[in-house]
Regions:
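A recognition module on extended beta-rich or small alphabeta surfaces enriched in W/G with H and D/E
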Residues: 119-134
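Surface-exposed polar/charged interaction patches
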Residues: 13-16, 61, 78, 120
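Long, contiguous N-terminal structural blocks used for assembly/anchoring
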Residues: 1-52
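Surface-exposed beta-strand edges and their flanking turn/coil or helix-capping segments
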Residues: 21, 25, 56, 109-111, ...
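Amphipathic protein-protein interaction modules
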Residues: 55-114
Length: 134
C-alpha cells in the first residue's frame, strides 16, 4: 500500500503562490472544494490526522463511500498525490507541518509560527509544488 505521510516535515508554500497572506478556501457552485474540505479537516483538528487519513476521508466523502478498510486499501493501491500538491500550499498560502507521528497542522503564512517552522533546522523542508511549470 502506498502512503503520502510525512514525518518531522514542513511543507512551505510554493514559490509561485499567488497570495501574500493565507486565505481560507471558499465553496464553488454551492459545493465544498477539496481545498475547503482539507482546510476544515486539518484546521479544526490540528495534529489529529495523517495525510493518508485526510486524503482518504475526503475521497470517501466525495465519492459517498463508507470509510472502511477495504475502500482504503483500494484507494491507496494506486499512488496518490501527497500534500505538496494540495491547493492549501500552492494557492491559499498555508504551511503544513507534520510532527514525529505524521500528524499534521496548518500554519498561516504571515504567522510567527510559520516563520519559526520555516527556520527550524530539525525539520525536513519541502515546498508545495509550483502552480505552473517553468
Amino acid at each position: 500500500m502506498h502512503t503520502t505521510n510525512y514525518y518531522n516535515t514542513f511543507i512551505e508554500i510554493s514559490d509561485d503562490c499567488p497570495v501574500f497572506e493565507s486565505e481560507i478556501p471558499k465553496e464553488r457552485g454551492g459545493n465544498k472544494t477539496v481545498a475547503l474540505l482539507q482546510f476544515e479537516m486539518i484546521a479544526h483538528n490540528p495534529y489529529q490526522f495523517t495525510s493518508d487519513e485526510v486524503l482518504f476521508n475526503i475521497h470517501a466523502l466525495r465519492k459517498d463511500l463508507p470509510p472502511n478498510e477495504e475502500n482504503k486499501q483500494e484507494f491507496f493501491s494506486k499512488g496518490q498525490a501527497c500534500f505538496r500538491a494540495s491547493p492549501l500550499g500552492k494557492r491559499y498560502g498555508w504551511g503544513i507541518h507534520f510532527d514525529e507521528n505524521g500528524k499534521m497542522a496548518l500554519y498561516n503564512l504571515d504567522s510567527p509560527e510559520y516563520q519559526n517552522l520555516k527556520a527550524d533546522p530539525n525539520l525536513k523542508h519541502v515546498k508545495a509544488m509550483r502552480n505552473k511549470k517553468l
